[in-house]
Amino acid sequence: VQSDAIVINQCEPFAWREFKRDSYRIRFLSCGERGVGLSRNTALMRAERDICLFSDDDLIYRDGYEEKIIQAFEDFPEADVLVFNIQSIDNKKSRYQIQKPMRIRWFNFARYGAARTAIRRTSILQHHLSFSLLFGGGAQYSCGEDTLFLHDCLKAGLRIYAVPITLAD
């Protein structure tokens, strides 16, 4: 990790730990609650920066990812949400690869997962958006929380763009 981070770990016992790694502030919350949507909402509520990146525990970020995200938001100042590429390791999981910058709309929003998504936190909070607690790993329905989140962003009128920048493997 080469940025400040909030890590939500779904395990017992409940614990909050904060530490520095290099010059970055890492906040680590362990809680027994289950559900990826709940974890993402918990992190979103505790975030202090305006630009936030959602992640999964199996990603390995490439050097300079923080600067790439900040630059992308500067390149798309009207964007509320940006979606990036994640490269599949050993082609075990095929992921849609963004080839050129484009606006995400109703006809193409369903192909992107939350782990490749960065947001302007103020836009999300102003529109009272959050991840569904019924969908996603650990919830009643085991997938779809990321698609519902992007759906809700579009419904709220947020501007979403896809950019051909790879952040992680």
Spans of model-derived segments:
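The conserved acidic donor/metal-binding loop of glycosyltransferases
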Residues: 56-60
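Catalytic beta-strand/loop signature of glycosyltransferases that borders the donor
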Residues: 131-133, 157-168
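Acidic donor-binding loop at a coil-to-helix junction in glycosyltransferase catalytic cores
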Residues: 136-148
